Every structure is written in C-alpha cells, then in structure tokens.
C-alpha cells in the first residue's frame, strides 16, 4: 500500500476534531422527521444559523459520536449523539426546559479502556468510586447516593446523568480532570448514573458478531 | 437478625408520593401494586427506589408505557420518562423485576420476528446498536437467555422503553406485539442490562 503524501500545510491543526483514523458525519434537518432544509457536517459547527438553518428539528448521525449543545458556541446543556436516528428534539434531550440545539462538535473517543473515578466532594475528596469498563445505571447500587462533586476521567469517554437509568441532564467527561462540578457546567453536584460512550469505528470491543 | 417469614420481602422496596419532589401523601411498597388508585393514590408523582429493580407503568394493570426503575431518587416525571413527545407525568402501577443479574446477562436479538434473520448476541450494554455494528435501527424478536434487559427506541436509552425479562414467557419475545401494549414498531436503537 502506498501512503499518500500530504503536504504539511494541510495537516489538521489540533482543534480536537478527533482525526485519529475515524470519520465524523452528521446530517441536521430544520424540521422533525428528517424534513426541511438539511446540512451535512464532518466537523464542528459553532452556530447552526451559519448554515442557514433556523433550528435543528431532527438529526441523523452516520458516524460519530457527536456532542450537541443547547446554545451556540458549545454552551448550555449537552446532548450526546451516537450513531442512529433522532427524529425529534425529545429523542436527544430529556429537559423540558429547552428544545434548542444550536451548536455541535465531534466527541473524542480516547481509548478502548474505560476508567473513571467519582468523588463525593470537590477537589477529589470524600468517598471515591472507581468504575472500570462498565456502565452504572444506579450509583446507589454501588454505595454512592446522588452526589458526585469531582471527577477524574482516566480513560475513555463517559457521560453522567442527573437521574438513575440515564435520565435528566447529561454531562460528558472526556479524558481529564474535573475538580468541581462547575467545570462540567452543572449547577449542583447531582449525578445518579454514568456510562461509557462507545463506537466500533474507534474500537471493536463490544461490537456485534452477527451471524 | 430476625428471620423473616417471607425471605424475599427485603429485596424490593419503593417509597412513593402523590406530589412531585417527595411531597404529599407517602406510602411504602415491597411487592406488586396493580393499581395505585385502589391503594389511595390517584397517581404517583415522585418516588425513591430503596432496593431492587422495578418497572412502573403508565396505566393500572401493568399497561401502557413502561419505565425501568433502579435504585435512586425520582423527584419528577422527567427522571423516569424517556419520551417527552408522549408526556406521561404519572405512574399507575408497578412491580419488582425479579430476574435482573447485571453481571451475568445474555440476550439474543434477531432481525426478523420469530427468531429469524440475522442474529446478534449481547452480554454488555449497547447505547447505540448502529454504532456497535447492528445493521439497521430495528429488531424483529428477542430471546433473553439470562437477566433482565431494557431496550429503547432511540440511541442513548431514549424514547419508549421495552422491558425484556428471562422469567417472563421463557424469555421469548417473538413479535413486537409481545413487547408491551405501547409497542407499535420494531424501532430499537439502544439496549442495556437492568441493574439489581
């Protein structure tokens, strides 16, 4: 196989679009059920209005994952968008406050391994819970209650939720340190479930072996 | 330790309130509730699961939309409903899920009804079937080998939920009709194990 030479000026300049061998492709539609004006994206979009869409009414993720935001410039409530069809706003948002999705960006997938440390108090203090390669629909079942105030995402990409069973406001944890809940844009340290974000275009582990 | 007459009675406990945010009339249940109105609750608007996994239903008699409920606090309807399009702010019956074994769950899914067509096997959670290689956004039938599972219309466990149990009709869910009274299509894009 001959590798194509790519001139240095065309190299991706680390904006974090996850250019590590995978593709990102998403189609946003102005109306519900994949109707109306549409726009195909393969990189981040700070404001859907820039693409002449007034709003986002439905979404098809062809390869991802992506992260949507309630407001432009990647602000406000977060919505994890994994490969699949999202025909209406309530298929990605659990918040009755807002049906708005105004910006979106590719979501980094770090490694096939997943490890996260949750702490009861800010600054990585108080009781600690380690989760390795598993999803936890109720932190209560593991001795925690409803309070998580700081997080270390050691490997992988994770998403935490206010309520058990992956309900309520979502907060994404990309590999990194989150000393205080305001670093994940929460207004209170409330988290009752947490899960991994996985996709076979990045890592085959856990994929279907169809027969 | 006091020996209980019913050894299972400590395994499931739900505390319910008839107002949101744990307000109003309160009651504890450790077994099935076929109809909350018959127990003096016109509806349940907040609750706490103290032990075990439960399934709640929109209507009396375990009918209508299903809500899988694991340990934790559910102060308002958006904490248990995954679908805002069909707004359900109440729960009128509920029962324990007795077969949940989170770590040892196994499920077979089939492209067509009656266990026909392409087959896939799961023993771990799957927040997006398309992302993990299931071609398409629908499932025709399920065979639950062990544990309890919940599948959802949309990725990330959103939309209508369908509970699949290994101890209900031998774990066989041959047709959409058998998934629940609210099931209209075979659209399924995420599946996960229920945690006891």
Swiss-Prot record, chain A:
Region (Connecting peptide): 109-113
PROSITE patterns: CRYSTALLIN_BETA_GAMMA
Keywords: Eye lens protein, Repeat
Cross-referenced InterPro entries: Beta/Gamma-Crystallin, Beta/gamma_crystallin, G_crystallin-like
Transmembrane segments: none
Coiled-coil region: none
GO MF, any single term: structural constituent of eye lens
Pfam families: Crystall (PF00030)
Highest taxon above the source species: Eukaryota
Region Disordered, residue ranges: 1-21
Family: Belongs to the beta/gamma-crystallin family.
Assembly with partners or alone: Homo/heterodimer, or complexes of higher-order. The structure of beta-crystallin oligomers seems to be stabilized through interactions between the N-terminal arms.
Entry note about domains: Has a two-domain beta-structure, folded into four very similar Greek key motifs.
Protein name, UniProt field: Beta-crystallin B3
Taxon lineage: Eukaryota, Metazoa, Chordata, Craniata, Vertebrata
From Swiss-Prot, chain B:
InterPro entries, A to Z: Beta/Gamma-Crystallin, Beta/gamma_crystallin, G_crystallin-like
Gene3D superfamilies, A to Z: Crystallins
Keyword Repeat recorded: yes
GO biological process entries: lens development in camera-type eye; visual perception
GO MF annotation list: structural constituent of eye lens
PROSITE patterns documented for this protein: CRYSTALLIN_BETA_GAMMA
Every Beta/gamma crystallin 'Greek key' domain range: 12-51, 52-98, 105-146, 147-195
Keyword flag Repeat: yes
Region of interest: Connecting peptide: 99-104
Pfam families membership: Crystall
Location of the region described as N-terminal arm in the Swiss-Prot/TrEMBL record: 1-11
Record keywords: Eye lens protein, Repeat
Similarity-based family: Belongs to the beta/gamma-crystallin family.
Description of its domains: Has a two-domain beta-structure, folded into four very similar Greek key motifs.
Subunit structure: Homo/heterodimer, or complexes of higher-order. The structure of beta-crystallin oligomers seems to be stabilized through interactions between the N-terminal arms.
Task of the protein: Crystallins are the dominant structural components of the vertebrate eye lens.
Protein name: Beta-crystallin A4
